Amino acid sequence: MESAITISNHVNLAFSLSRNPSLSTKNSAGISCIKWQRPCLRNLGHVRLNQQRKGTRRKSTLVQAVAVPVAQPSAFPPTDNTEHLKQLAERYGFQQIGEPLPDDVTMRDIITSLPKQVFEINDTKAWGTVLISVTSYALGIFMIAKAPWYLLPLAWAWTGTAITGFFVIGHDCAHKSFSKNKLVEDIVGTLAFMPLIYPYEPWRFKHDQHHTKTNMLREDTAWLPIMKEDIESSPGLRKALIYAYGPLRTWMSIAHWLKVHFNLKDFRQSEVKRATISLAAVFAFMVIGWPLIIYKTGIVGWIKFWLMPWLGYHFWMSTFTIVHHTAPHIPFKSSKEWNAAQAQLSGTVHCDYPRWIEILCHDISVHIPHHISPKIPSYNLRAANQSLNENWGEYLNKPKSNWRLMRTIMTTCHIYDKDGNYVSFEKAVPEESQPISIPKRVMPDYA
């Protein structure tokens, strides 16, 4: 997913890959850079093809075996690097921080390692996700209507999570992984986005660029990190960014929603017609749906039944997308340095959440396979992720949702410096960083 924050933070720490067979570490600003030997992964696709021809491909399970990358012997014991990554994982709230992916691994190598079944569209499963979202949303509205005031936050949390599922359904439609009928996808995607006041086509056009240029400086439309020049440009902007990346960070997708999707001048001429239709659908919901809600329940009812669940949706939109691509060890690269396979496999994070959240949100948190191929339907992401774990597991970033992970992101990953690592607001502008103390006080430091 996408998803959905205009400005994101990534550390300028990049695990340097070298053909030198030695392994060494050096520390800078509390974060270690690693040099390690590159495994020989050329001809990976050919090895797999030969296996298929010889009939060695496993047919009994969805997760199929392929040639697994194996590093050549190193001059230092591999436990050195393993122990170092374990220490980083503990510090940042991760279960695993992946080894650096070698330069000569390509997206084709990774995609061809996935079983063909994970790309197959199943209409029954697709419409099953719609049933789950509609049913869970209806239950949420019932809970809001019947709950006493002190239980309303729980009802809002459930309903906001349920309508996040609407976004994921539209997300599948935008990636052409919901139905083989493209008109059906356009209609379902538009309808799913309408109650979120999200214009479907404008989002789709911008989100496609996020996938083609993930973690690329200046180019990734969903992930544009704060740079030093942003902080230095204006006191007003600096103050706004400190608040936005402090207590308001888990709702920053609202800023992205407002800025990116409503100006037709931001789209190519060939995109304007479809963008206009989506905007008309959104405004129709506002003009018809909002007055109807207010007529039936009053302004308080509009707040209870629409606004609060909508804010709950944006909480998840922001949280998912922050965690998907933000960590002290995940680099942002210029277009000249950028490597597609490294950005999609190692620059993306798979995070486990409580299962009820994953069910209502259709496994959008299983995000690495989605970045390997957006054509994988949401209901096949777990099978694809299992295959990636079998064949590329050592390179994957894996946390479970926990306080230390969020505390690290919220209080550390602020200003991106091309010549160093993440710099927190507390270090860069200590006299103005009081808003950062709020999440620092509220969020416990345990994983």
Swiss-Prot record:
Catalytic reactions of this protein: a (9Z)-octadecenoyl-containing glycerolipid + 2 reduced [2Fe-2S]-[ferredoxin] + O2 + 2 H(+) = a (9Z,12Z)-octadecadienoyl-containing glycerolipid + 2 oxidized [2Fe-2S]-[ferredoxin] + 2 H2O
Span(s) of short sequence motif Histidine box-3: 367-371
Chloroplast among keywords: yes
Positions of short motif Histidine box-1: 171-175
Motif (Histidine box-2): 207-211
Subcellular location: Plastid, Chloroplast membrane
Modified residues (N-acetylvaline): V66
Top-level taxon in the UniProt lineage: Eukaryota
Family: Belongs to the fatty acid desaturase type 1 family.
Name this protein carries in UniProt: Omega-6 fatty acid desaturase, chloroplastic
